[in-house]
């Protein structure tokens, strides 16, 4: 996609168990009826968009794009906000974030991080298959406990946090680069 030719919408907050919000085609029909031209599609609702299948199947991606085109829609970006957050969870936040991962890795911070990295790398592949050149995600929360500390900021803690972020994110960024997709961080302090 070179230029967005109208408004776009992030689908995540509208996904529900009831029609039309329980399928990608239902969401596409709804969004198109409201005049939207592009969808940002989250990768954490397999029944809406299967990131595993999209990473491995050009046909799946072509089918999704074709269905959206029938509704005069295109994909602006895929998003891995929750998975990106799980790449770098500060230990103080382990419990609150455990619900964002599959039960099999939810309570194991290392396995959860590795699962999230795998999803992000699949999102790079899927983005390339879909012809996308941008991807939306969060960076994690390693430094959040240090944002408003008392006594004043400890630069060593920030340096350590950002070195660790670089260590965790460089392989992911390299994968996106390999597929020609830019990562767009959406930074939230909470």
Predicted regions and their residues:
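N-terminal carbohydrate-binding accessory modules
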Residues: 1-3, 30-33, 67
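Boundary/entry segment of secreted carbohydrate-active catalytic domains
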Residues: 2-22
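Structural preference for beta-strand elements that scaffold enzyme active sites
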Residues: 4-10, 36-40, 70-79, 132-136, ...
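Active-site beta-loop-alpha junctions enriched in small/polar residues
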Residues: 10-16, 42-44, 80-83, 140-142, ...
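Aromatic- and glycine-enriched glycan-recognition loops and surfaces
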Residues: 20-25, 52-66, 114-119, 167
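Catalytic domains of carbohydrate-active enzymes, especially glycoside hydrolases
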Residues: 23-45, 122, 129-134
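Glycine-rich, proline-tolerant flexible connector loops at the mouths of alpha/beta enzymes
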Residues: 40-69, 84, 139-147
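Active-site acidic/histidine proton-transfer and metal-coordination neighborhood
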Residues: 70, 87-190
């Amino acid at each position: 996609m070179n230029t967005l030719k109208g408004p776009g919408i992030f689908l995540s907050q509208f996904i529900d168990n009831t029609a039309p919000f329980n399928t990608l085609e239902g969401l596409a029909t709804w969004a198109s009826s409201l005049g939207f031209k592009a969808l940002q599609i989250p990768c954490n609702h397999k029944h809406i968009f299967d990131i595993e299948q999209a990473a491995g199947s050009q046909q799946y991606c072509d089918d999704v794009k074709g269905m959206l085109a029938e509704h005069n829609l295109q994909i602006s970006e895929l998003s891995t906000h929750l998975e990106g957050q799980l790449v770098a969870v500060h230990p103080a936040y382990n419990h609150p974030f455990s619900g964002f991962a599959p039960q099999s890795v939810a309570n194991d911070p290392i396995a959860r991080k590795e699962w999230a990295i795998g999803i992000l790398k699949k999102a790079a592949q899927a983005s390339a298959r879909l012809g996308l050149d941008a991807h939306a995600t969060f960076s994690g929360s390693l430094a959040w406990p240090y944002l408003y500390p008392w006594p004043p900021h400890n630069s060593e803690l920030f340096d350590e946090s950002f070195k660790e972020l670089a260590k965790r994110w460089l392989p992911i960024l390299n994968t996106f680069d390999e597929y020609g997709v830019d990562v767009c961080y959406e930074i939230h302090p909470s």
